[in-house]
Each structure stands twice: as C-alpha cells, then as structure tokens.
Amino acid sequence: MFARSAATILAFVLVTLTAATPAYYAPGTKTTSVDKAVPAGQCNVGNQQCCNTVQEASSNPVAGLLGLLGVNVQDVTGLVGLTCNPITGIGGLNSNCDASPVCCENNSFGSLISIGCIPISL
C-alpha cells in the first residue's frame, strides 16, 4: 500500500515539475534556411562579403546592435551579416570564404555589420 502511494506521489511531483519548468532556448542558436543562393556573378564585387555570422534582423543579438546604430529593425530586408570582410578577387572568383559568403546592400558600418544580405555561391 505504501509503495503504491509513494509511486503515485513521485509521479505527480515529476509531472508538476516538468510542466512548471520553462523551456530553455540557447541565445544565438537561431538558424536560417535559404532556398536558393545567388551566383556570385550576379552581385556587385564591392557588395560581396564573407561574414562569420548571418542572422535575421529580428534575432536578439542583431536587433540589439541595430538599435545601437539607430537602425529600425522593421526597415531591414534580407539577412544581417556580423563581422564581415570583403571578398577579394575578380568577380569573387578564386576567392576563399570559410564562413558565410553573402551579397549585402549596405556595408556602411565597417566590418562589424552588413545589412540586407543574401547568401551567394562562390
């Protein structure tokens, strides 16, 4: 009799704790899927960037950076690249990018952030 009561109480406690525990989402782990990459030849050479991170403008770290720069998140189209470097080479050919090669519209924030990016294939 006691074993049955203890098992019932234990099951109730476990269910209660599981239901009351908030879900954990690790910051910065949001991934973005892209259906089709633009060929590098269709992007202006000066706009080709190799970014360490590419995320949606609404993601937590990117939205915070955009806010500090005075950029409205709702006005951003495309992805946002962080810590980007220009891809050198004629038309992006024979260039090497081990991170995320993207074509960005607005690179006016130096190498910290590039706005309006779309993935490209080199």
Swiss-Prot record:
It is found in: Secreted; Secreted, Cell wall. InterPro entries: Hydrophobin (IPR001338). Residues 1-20 form the signal peptide. CDD domains: hydrophobin_I. Glycans are attached at residue 106. Induction: A CT-rich motif, which is often found immediately upstream of the transcription start point of highly expressed filamentous fungal genes, is present at the expected position. One additional CT-rich region is also found upstream of the TATA box in the promoter region. Disulfide bonds join 43-103, 50-97, 51-84, 104-117. Keywords: Cell wall, Disulfide bond, Glycoprotein, Secreted, Signal. GO terms for cellular component: extracellular region; fungal-type cell wall. Pfam families: Hydrophobin. GO terms for molecular function: structural constituent of cell wall. Belongs to the fungal hydrophobin family. Self-assembles to form functional amyloid fibrils called rodlets. Self-assembly into fibrillar rodlets occurs spontaneously at hydrophobic:hydrophilic interfaces and the rodlets further associate laterally to form amphipathic monolayers. Aerial growth, conidiation, and dispersal of filamentous fungi in the environment rely upon a capability of their secreting small amphipathic proteins called hydrophobins (HPBs) with low sequence identity. Class I can self-assemble into an outermost layer of rodlet bundles on aerial cell surfaces, conferring cellular hydrophobicity that supports fungal growth, development and dispersal; whereas Class II form highly ordered films at water-air interfaces through intermolecular interactions but contribute nothing to the rodlet structure. This is Class I hydrophobin 4. It comes from Flammulina velutipes (Agaricus velutipes). The lineage of its organism: Eukaryota, Fungi, Dikarya, Basidiomycota, Agaricomycotina. The gene is Hyd-4.
